[in-house]
A protein has these predicted regions:
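Hydrophobic packing residues within well-ordered alpha-helices of enzyme cores
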Residues: 61-65, 133, 288, 317-318
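Short phosphate-binding loop-to-helix
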Residues: 69-114
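Short, surface-exposed amphipathic charged segments that create phosphate/polyanion-binding patches used
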Residues: 87-98, 164-169, 283-287
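Short beta-strand-to-loop acidic/aromatic patch adjacent to the donor-nucleotide binding site
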Residues: 114-124
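Conserved core of the sugar-phosphate nucleotidyltransferase
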Residues: 127-216
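Conserved alpha/beta core of the MobA/IspD/sugar-nucleotide pyrophosphorylase nucleotidyltransferase superfamily
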Residues: 173-175, 182-305
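Single conserved hydrophobic/aromatic residue that forms the stacking wall/gate
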Residues: 306-318
Length: 318
């Protein structure tokens, strides 16, 4: 069986954080979170990385993140632009926001002919997540006419921030770790001993326990999902252009839920023992720096994650 591929979603505008957080250094050697992700994926058995980026950051991205990909991994670049639409569709006037995670994955279709995982560029998922995902993708095949998908799940309390709201896919799982549904909650805030979400700009709030299982967009798919994404995109556009032309997004969890409902796929929730870390807001950065420093100290990572021909000059981080 082919080694699985890793599709990294790096085209987001970083509207809440500001700047290109995909390239923001998190240690004195200049590594960003994305470097740790690629390193973990390679040692777990992934053989290819597909970066989904915007043309506007291509040069900087290739000279930094792209240049640091470990030897032995195939590297591809796909481009998510707001005007990457099916024939007959035009960008709504005033639209600058990308069309969402499912559209980003669809942009990688020309480079995918093997099982693959999808991650966010600016999320740290932990070593174990890549191991369990690689094991799943290399050991599961279609059964009873259903394509085997997977997701690494995390407890909500381990994924919220003190510094603002987050967006999470809230999961319903059966006793066999099979996903029943994902509901996207785009505005979740942390409280003292739980979280709350709103769908009406704060007019009303509903409670979510910290042990609620959520998706952090770490999915594993078979190549067939690309055709499903392509078929579903026009229907999404028809609705979004009518109801929310400037901010409507095509989400991976929504597509996955539809395929589960239609009996075309099953989705197993994989258990990872590792903590998730991310930088949604600038104030989150120091906690990520501290966590990665602790992982280097305990031997999880060596100082340099990449093979380089010349020494890397340590840099200051702030």
């Amino acid at each position: 069986m082919k080694k699985p591929a890793l599709v990294i979603l790096a085209a987001g505008m970083g509207s809440r954080y500001g700047g290109l957080k995909q390239m923001d250094p998190m240690d004195s050697m200049g590594h960003a979170i994305i470097d740790y992700s690629i390193y973990d994926a390679k040692r777990a058995g992934f053989g290819k990385v597909v970066f989904v980026i915007k043309k506007a950051i291509e040069k900087d991205f290739k000279e930094t993140v792209g240049a640091r990909v470990p030897e032995g991994m195939e590297v591809c670049y796909a481009y998510q632009e707001v005007d990457a639409l099916p024939e007959g569709y035009n960008v709504p006037e005033g639209r600058v926001k990308p069309w969402g995670t499912a559209h980003a994955v669809l942009c990688a279709k020309p480079f995918i002919n093997e099982p693959f995982a999808v991650i966010n560029a600016d999320d740290y998922y932990g070593v174990d997540g890549y191991k369990v995902m690689a094991d799943f993708l290399t050991s599961h095949e279609e059964k009873d006419g259903k394509a085997p998908f997977a997701m690494v799940g995390y407890h909500l309390g381990n994924t919220v921030t003190e510094n603002g709201y987050v967006s999470r896919g809230v999961c319903e799982v059966d006793d066999n770790h099979q996903l029943l549904s994902i509901t996207e909650r785009t505005h979740i805030e942390k409280r003292e001993d739980h979280a709350e979400f709103t769908e009406d700009d704060g007019a009303t709030w509903a409670s979510l326990p910290f042990d609620t299982l959520v998706s952090m967009n770490f999915f594993g798919f078979q190549p067939m999902i690309m055709d499903e994404l392509e078929k579903g995109f026009p229907a999404f556009l028809n609705q979004a252009i009518k109801e929310n032309p400037l901010k409507g997004e095509y989400f991976i969890p929504s597509v996955a839920s539809d395929l589960l409902h239609d009996g075309k796929a099953s989705l197993e929730v994989l258990v990872s023992k590792d903590q998730w870390y991310g930088v949604t807001y600038p104030e989150d950065k120091q906690s990520v720096i501290d966590a990665l420093a602790a992982l280097r100290e305990n031997g999880t990572y060596k100082l340099s994650l990449i093979h380089i021909s010349e020494p890397t000059r340590p840099i200051s981080i702030s």
